[in-house]
Amino acid sequence: MENYEFKQKIESLVSVFISEPQKPYTLSELIQLAAAHGAGLSHIVAAQAMAQEKFSYEILLDRVMESFRHNLGVCELGLTRGKSFLLGTVASDLAQANREGRALIEDDLINRAMTYTLATEVGNHEVGLNPCAGTGDSCPYTGLIRALMEHPYPEEKVALATALILKIGSIFRVGKQTTGCNMEGLGAGAAATAAVLTELRGGTPAQIGRAMVLALSPTIAVPCTPRVMVPGLCATHITGAILLGNQGANLALKTSLPVPVDVDVMIAMAARIHREAAPVISSINIRYLRPFFETNEEVEKLVSEPIRKKEEEEKAAVLREAREEIRSMVKQSAPLTQTLGEIVFGGSSMAVGSPTNMGRVAHKLAGGGIIRVKIELTYDLFSRRAINVPGILMGALYGSQTDDIESYRQVVGDVLRRGIPVELAPVAEPEVQRIWLETQEKKVMVDSRNRGGGRLAIVDALPSKEEAIAAAKELGIVVAV
């Protein structure tokens, strides 16, 4: 590097950290510092590193790029002659296809980043990588860096982008404590990609935070390590990081989409869910997919015939069970042209449509004249009461259908104006949506379970479950098993 556009600015920022260089600033705190000093987030990250590691600006950027030297070489190996035991020659296949036109996506930078991400994974299976949270997130990091190096960005900007990747990666490296692509290739990769692309496209530090939240959200609770022992599956995980990061960046930069969640909250939640969910989800992954794991022929020669026979039987059993599970779903599905449900206002057929239909069933049983209401919702639904309580109340008090926008908007005010007692309570049991209605003559109750598409499962009711199911069918509400 010969010309340094940002050197003076970043050197002046070192003073922000010099009194307490090892202070553990969170990512959101660094974003706030960057905004306060009119600096890029990568500038603040570089200044902090200079204060902590006692490097000059030039040496820091050299060290940052040097940290990816091996991984970039691995990328080249995967792109040219590498062959993975799980991904085959996917990278060189794409390199060939790219000669005739962009193989994966029309955006040249993103297409290159995705191709090089896969190339890095292929090379990883040949010679290994320097890991961050794991070798998984090193793939999108390396793929993105190589794509940026080939794009007409100055070397200094690429080095600063790489520093930002390392900073974000360092947090995920600590947060990843068990199996999980959500804290590695998919999640960490998406967050870092979003941050880098947002900054390079002229985004503010605040926009970087929003882009990261948007990119990270779909990745949470995706522990995939056992799953990727199945050939091919990892390909969409690690390239998905690039796609999600790009999408998060564009949404943050080009729209007024509200994103109220702090990025520290999002990463902390991702790490916590990662620890809690991975053991449960991984055991299910393994049950279904272990028969499809890649094997080593030489190792298999060491396994006894009875064990191999048992595993073949397990594979056949998994196929049978899976087909029966899908067959059960098919039996419950509607005719092709009746697949879609009734219009649901409020934003979610599960969070609003299903509870609203519960209210409609209760209204049908009560016959109108409601003088008291009690609603119990599982924690997930209770936390979304802003959107589902209006639906439940309009269904229960008016018998309104799920598409009645006017009733949805006026019912809570009507309840408050008329002074109808309404009790709302959370319950710990999953899926629960339960309602009691009281009239001058009787009390009715519908105890149901939340289902998507506006459906509901009725488990109990007053005067009877049978009458509730009959009422639902009369109203055209789909009762799920």
Tell what function each PLM region has.
Residues 152-160, 202-209, 254-263:
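Structural helix-adjacent loops and short alpha-helical linkers that scaffold large soluble proteins
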Residues 126-139, 144-162, 168-171, 176:
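Glycine- and small hydrophobic-enriched segments that form the cores of compact globular domains
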Residues 100-103, 123-135, 175-184, 229-235, ...:
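A short glycine/serine-rich beta->alpha loop
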Residues 106-123, 155-174, 218-224, 362-372:
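Acidic-glycine-rich active-site phosphate/pyrophosphate-binding loop
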